[in-house]
UniProtKB/Swiss-Prot annotation:
Signal peptide: none annotated. It comes from Mus musculus (Mouse). Glycans are attached at residue 5. This is Type III endosome membrane protein TEMP. Pfam families: LRR19-TM. Residues 49-111 are cytoplasmic. Keywords: Cell membrane, Endosome, Glycoprotein, Membrane, Signal-anchor, Transmembrane, Transmembrane helix. Its main location: membrane. GO terms for cellular component: early endosome; plasma membrane; recycling endosome. The keyword Transmembrane helix applies. Residues 1-27 are extracellular.
Length: 111
């Protein structure tokens, strides 16, 4: 019985000491190096384009182009609303309610 056990153990040791093949993870390093190199090259190209101002004329042409007059059809003409004083009115504070409190507080705390 002892002889049979030794052959099984020696077979297990030989199977675990073999080097892994290319299919089990040997190709992971070249892929990782390729991705890192691609990212570095892309960032260098973007930095060079920014430093050399390659896109400046395209950016300037968008900045200095006048707006088209076709898009302004939904705006009301200037001077149409006479009540527009520049303040946003919500109905949380009623108009005129603050004026009465200020006059009453002045009479109460007059010096």
């Amino acid at each position: 019985m002892i002889g049979g056990n030794t052959t099984i153990i020696s077979g297990a040791i030989n199977a675990s000491t073999e080097a892994p093949g290319l299919g089990t993870g040997g190709r992971a390093w070249p892929v990782l190096v390729g991705v890192v190199l691609g990212a570095v090259v892309l960032s260098i190209l973007i930095a060079l384009a920014a430093k050399c101002h390659l896109c400046r004329r395209y950016h300037a042409s968008y900045r200095h182009r006048p707006l088209s007059s076709a898009g302004g059809g939904n705006r009301p003409p200037v001077g149409e609303d006479e009540d527009d004083d520049g303040f946003i009115e919500d109905n949380y504070i009623q108009p005129g309610a603050g004026e009465m409190e200020t006059t009453g507080s002045r009479d109460h705390f007059s010096l």
